[in-house]
């Protein structure tokens, strides 16, 4: 009996030891398949339900039994199954991003870009490179309209090169415009329209200066709550455009990659006008428009972290209105370098455009007005005169951005960026001698010269603090200087001698000169709290000072707060923020007009009375929303309320 018990005990111990030795430890690291960055908080579980979470370096260790499988998951990424045989040694698990609401990084504030799941406000992201790989867009309106909820974009009329109008969630009042501010690669972009020689409805659009094929992604920050970190000009929202920095996928060392694309298209009027009346004049007036575009890009990877990108684009667009043409040539280069704790990014782009804009918004003297009135284009203006008149712009634009970053001891990150946007536009309008317009058949000519300059200089410092096992805090402080300058001089002349169009020979001449400068300085502080990679809280405060506000107003403060909580396939979010709209350049100052001459000099009267106490319009917004991703679809719901104070109202003197 004793022998039997000993044998039974020995068998039991052997079985236990065998089970213990059969169980092994699987170790590895979880990485983003595209960026190779470690994924913190990825869930690794076995078939029997045992779970661990990857650490700050994306690493994990878990006990497994023979025959089990490992499942690795992370919010915003596709799940991956691994046989135990693949995990006997240290394994690198690369997860691909899935089609979920958290799949991309977006601009969370002026100071940071984060995974979308960490953003508590309504920010839309558009992968422009993927869309343009499947088709062609003539302008920003074609690319964005209908793809971003809560925003509509359209051209002011059907001609090529025309201004793009925005109808998006904003806080603008009746006195101010509704256009958002635009950043391209961190540079404040001058998106004002030019109408120096023509009407505002037929102005030259600045947004056409960016080749569509150079755009990598677009983030649309909607409403004052989301855009509060941008301060006194962001009540209409912000559009952040990031351009391409490489051709195709990631390159190996020493490799060269190239892409080329040619697009050809045609456009016609929406429909033939044949109902009820004979509209031959309308149908024959319009022509077939065309679009021809050629694009090429090259990328050279010299060493890891040392890469050069170059692109060229040429486009020829013709509208359906006779004489409407837009020809543009653009060059762009980008250089990226990373050596240890130092990072450098440089981007430079140049665009030259020649555009012809026949007028269709000047009342009785244009063909379209007469078409709408009498179904005939030549009611008050002859076809000979209309086709002889010319409105042309020669446009040159240079944009450049230099960014440098360095990681100090204790993981303190310093970053500075200098951006420049220079725009030179020459305008020319001619009515040749011998062509009757109204009562003038002796010629008319206007020339304009415009210089626009935007300078942006940012400094930023940030550091991450680990407050506990699952709690992390990132503090950021940013200083931003924005300077805008615009100067324009215009000379108009009429009544020329026969076949002479030199302005000096005209009997009547007039000169106009305008200029303005805006200087804005903003200081922004931000605290970002991350708990368990699911709950995110962001609090920020911005202080702005500008030469456009009244002399009795020292500065303006704009607070913001947002919260996001993530579940497996949904995100709850809420945000509150304040932002503003700066007054127009002359709102804070009184200026005078000449109303005649006297023996003592010109007679001056107030043309506009400024307000020493004027401050930016302030928009307060609170929003709450739900983002849900069922069965590889995306559903977003947002409710918001806005409140406006300090509204700017204009009254007669």
Show where each model-derived region lies.
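Short acidic/polar hinge/loop motifs at secondary-structure boundaries
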Residues: 61-63, 187-222
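Surface-exposed loop/turn segments flanking beta-strands in extracellular/periplasmic regions
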Residues: 273-281, 362-384, 428-445, 485-513, ...
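Short, acidic, small-residue-rich periplasmic hinge/interaction motif at the N-terminus
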Residues: 31-34, 42-45, 73-77, 88-132, ...
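Extracytoplasmic beta-strand/coil segments of soluble accessory domains associated
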Residues: 142-190, 217, 227-244
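Outer-membrane beta-barrel signature, preferentially recognizing the C-terminal barrel domain
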Residues: 379-399, 507-524, 587-636, 643
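Flexible loop and strand-edge segments within Gram-negative outer membrane beta-barrel domains
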Residues: 282, 291-313, 317-324, 328-398, ...
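A beta-strand signature from Gram-negative outer-membrane beta-barrel systems
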Residues: 91-93, 147-149, 212-259, 293
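N-terminal periplasmic "start-of-domain" segments of outer-membrane beta-barrel proteins
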Residues: 45, 49-52, 57-59, 107-134, ...
